[in-house]
Amino acid sequence: MLRFLNLPSLLGEGLGVRLKNINMQITLEELLKSRDERHAHQMELLKEHEGLTLVCLTVVMPGSVKRNVQSLVAAHAGVDALRERFAGETVALEERDLDTGYEAYLLTRLSPLEAKERACEIEETHMLGRLFDIDVIDASGCPLPRSIVGRGERRCLVCDGEARYCMRNHSHSLDELQARINSMIDAYVQRI
């Protein structure tokens, strides 16, 4: 259970607090449509800003509710981490709060490999890093794999095994995943 009440003061500037449609379930069709729209937006940004590297942040939130207090806290923390890690290298940062989840798009002059290294560092060292999905998108619109910078697979939130394996095999219940996310968010909020 989250132990804070003053969400606006906790989050400060940035994504803001849009409480409309919070905890609303989305359908698989809506989720798939949002992925297509995100890819189209990425391609548009790459076309408009040729020569820059695109970094895209989304929040890992299992289940049919993508916008909740936990994902809002994680998104805000992720955007703050991007701002800090890419300080002085950021050309533009766009944040989007959609019914299907939070997204941030950062354009940088860094090479795709250097941007991917920084993205992996955030995912691996931030308290909430496992809740961040930070992709570096190449000129063809494909995300660079972690292996390109010598990083291993993402780890599972619950057992620390390979996340892809646990997800594919439904190794953990939604309740287990949500309990772990709540615990991570609670610990993070207590520290800030």
Task: Please place each PLM-identified region on the residue numbering.
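Short beta-strand-to-loop capping motifs
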Residues: 59-61, 106-113
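Long, contiguous binding/interaction regions
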Residues: 22-89, 97-99, 117, 123-192
